[in-house]
Amino acid sequence: MEAGTEVGKLARELFGKPVDVTETVNGQLNLPAMTDRTQVEIEHETSVICEASFSYQGCYCAVDILKRENDGWAIYEVKSSTVNEKNMKAVYVADVAYQKYVLEHCGVRITGTYIVSINNDYVYDGKLDLERLFQITDVSEFVRNEIGEVEKNLLQEDTLLESENEPERELDYTVKIHMDVRIGNIVQKNYQLRPYLTYIGCR
């Protein structure tokens, strides 16, 4: 976790001076405050927002780096490992597709989706070169193919969350990811935060 946090901080430096909207209360992430602050930064035309937070019908996500473009916004998902075709398709693209799904349902136009990962060919020569340490992969085509699966997975998760029984088979990894997020939302609700967050017209 610490290594991932440090990589995330370094990756942010590729984008100048972004605004981090992370908010906490009693040591826990304050999701309503984060979504509210994200809206404020968007209205203030902030160029780059870190941990940009959105919620749509109980689905919450925080984008590692959200960068303003001429006609919309680009999602940058930071990974502390290298990217290969297998993990990109099986795990990373699913994450980004979920984020795009939530943001677009919140009225945010997404014009690009990227994964920022470690370049395993980089050799440290005594001076850190972030441009060479990281590689940025455009995953727009993969996300476009994956986006249709998001809603199907959410329907499956709704069934599982409402059931009193354990699932009969092991969950697909993508479903596990989304379940963790949505169970986290339930915990947040019990933390006396607003049960349904709203953002740019989401209900």
Show where each model-derived region lies.
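Cys/His-rich finger/ribbon microdomains and the adjacent scaffold used
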Residues: 1, 7, 129-203
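A broad, structural surface signal
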Residues: 9-13, 94-104, 148, 152-155, ...
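Alpha-helix initiation/capping motif
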Residues: 24-26, 30, 82, 89, ...
